[in-house]
Amino acid sequence: MKLLKASLVALSLAASTFVYADNGLIAIITPSHDNPFFKAEADGAKQKAEELGYTTLVASHDDDANKQDQLISTAVSRKAKAIILDNAGSDVTVGALEKAKAAGVPAFLIDREINKTGVAVSQIVSNNYQGAQLSAEKFVELMGEKGQYVELLGRESDTNASVRSQGFHEIIDEYPEMKMVAQQTANWSQTEGFSRMESILQANPNIKGVISGNDTMALGAEAALKAAGRTDVIVVGFDGSDYVRDSILAGGNIKATALQPAWDQAQEAVVQADKYIRTGSTGKEEKQLMDCILIDSSNAKKLNKFSLSK
């Protein structure tokens, strides 16, 4: 509760200390900025909104549905022109967005879908299934199509976690000599990725690879492997973070990841919000998929802030 109050106070102070731009206010709400993916979303959306002449409020719900509800309510009370949201849950988010819509505040979702259409104006998400297949194909290649491996799963309430896992197994399960010896949830967390990897490694010392539902967990797994002297174990992630880029280029355990373009996705959401505010339409379907890109040693140098340069 104290954290919630602190966030709301910060949001209120931010609103009161800005001089509003002519175009009004856009609220940008994401999960915790401790995760560089979500920070890239927030930074990308903020940059584009201010470039287009809007004042911005940036806040994090920390994957807490109640906190998210309060932040959306605050955005509505501040008469925001639009909300850019990476939500705290596909089901629990619907009610708050329905209230925002009824109050005339349109929502533009990024990264995570909700389980209802017609509530948000746009849902712009990565093609998680396609990206997971890219990661899995590279993982199988790096593993030589055989060996014991581990899968680290994301937060169970996040549909992206299950979609990515399904994409992984659509590819990996075609190879009978690939043997999954452990599958554990690490909740998108680097700390949990480290602790899960430590315990899994003790129980399964012969593992050859780790495939992870995001880069943050992959980095935690890599740290545990390094601490155990296991530089031989292959790790493949998902997201396209700069930290993973650095590991790939340095020849660390992490060999590849699937880039989901957080920066570009967030900026596109703001562009669509601006068009909707001005014209009443984005000119696009509500649900939009952005394909992921495989990142490995061949192109990692071009990666910066979840965006790949030409």
UniProtKB/Swiss-Prot annotation:
Stored InterPro entries: Peripla_BP_I, SBP_2_dom
Positions in coiled-coil regions: none
Signal peptide positions (record): 1-21
Compartmental location: Periplasm
SUPFAM superfamilies: Periplasmic binding protein-like I
Family matches, as PANTHER family: D-ALLOSE-BINDING PERIPLASMIC PROTEIN-RELATED
Similarity remark: Belongs to the bacterial solute-binding protein 2 family.
Name the UniProt record assigns to this protein: D-apiose import binding protein
Species for this entry: Actinobacillus succinogenes (strain ATCC 55618 / DSM 22257 / CCUG 43843 / 130Z)
